[in-house]
Design a protein with these regions (language model features):
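N-terminal FAD cofactor-binding segment of flavoenzymes
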Residues: 1-25
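Rossmann-like flavin
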Residues: 33-139
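Short beta-strand to alpha-helix junction loop
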Residues: 96-107, 149-170
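Conserved small/polar residues in nucleotide/adenosyl-binding loops
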Residues: 174
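Short polybasic amphipathic segments
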Residues: 27-32
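Generic structural marker for isolated residues within well-ordered, non-membrane alpha-helices
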Residues: 4-5, 48, 108, 165
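Residues forming anionic-ligand binding surfaces in small-molecule and nucleic-acid pockets
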Residues: 138-149
């Protein structure tokens, strides 16, 4: 929600005066073809317990994935997300950091390096799908979302995304 709070603040408004954000719990519920299920969200301890219930011993791989995604987040979100790449050399200077973060791997391949269970690999590779990407060929930089969700949670605007658009329009009119 903080990014929308910042956006509304640019116009001297408070986001909560226009739209309410609700915390989502669980963040995702995965139902697999074998009938098994995984609820993802909450504390990292709850997630590890849920993963180990589904696939004993895989919880450590998930923790390692989140720790790696924090490294990606530090570069991809904190350092680069608000930077213009309008000059070729601006992007070229980022190549060493992006290589160190294995950006040449797809989301699915990076997730697979931490998790062995095929169900978990699919579940924890979904983020590119949310923006129309394919986890099999979208850069692993999108794995930063694992840490982003851990840091800030998953939120939903009451009334759906249309209510968020309406709130932005109203804030501009007033």
């Amino acid at each position: 929600p903080f990014l929308f709070d910042e956006l509304f603040a640019l116009f001297g408004k408070k986001r909560e005066d226009y739209v309410e954000f609700l915390a989502v719990e669980p963040w995702y519920r995965f139902e697999f073809s074998d009938g098994s299920k995984l609820d993802y969200g909450g504390s990292i301890e709850d997630t590890v317990s849920e993963i180990n219930r589904l696939s004993p011993g895989e919880g450590k791989g998930y923790v390692d994935l989140v720790n790696f995604s924090k490294r990606i987040f530090k570069v991809g979100f904190e350092k680069l997300s608000d930077q213009p790449f309008h000059k070729f050399w601006t992007m070229v200077r980022q190549v060493p950091a992006l290589l160190a973060l294995k950006s040449y791997l797809s989301v699915y391949r990076l997730v697979s390096s931490f998790l062995k269970d095929a169900r978990l690999r699919r579940a924890f590779s979904i983020h590119p799908l949310l923006v129309g990407g394919n986890p099999m060929n979208t850069t692993s930089i999108y794995c930063l979302i694992h840490y982003l969700e851990r840091k800030w949670g998953v939120w939903f605007p009451r009334g759906g995304t249309g209510s968020l658009v309406d709130a932005l329009v109203l804030s501009l009119i007033h």
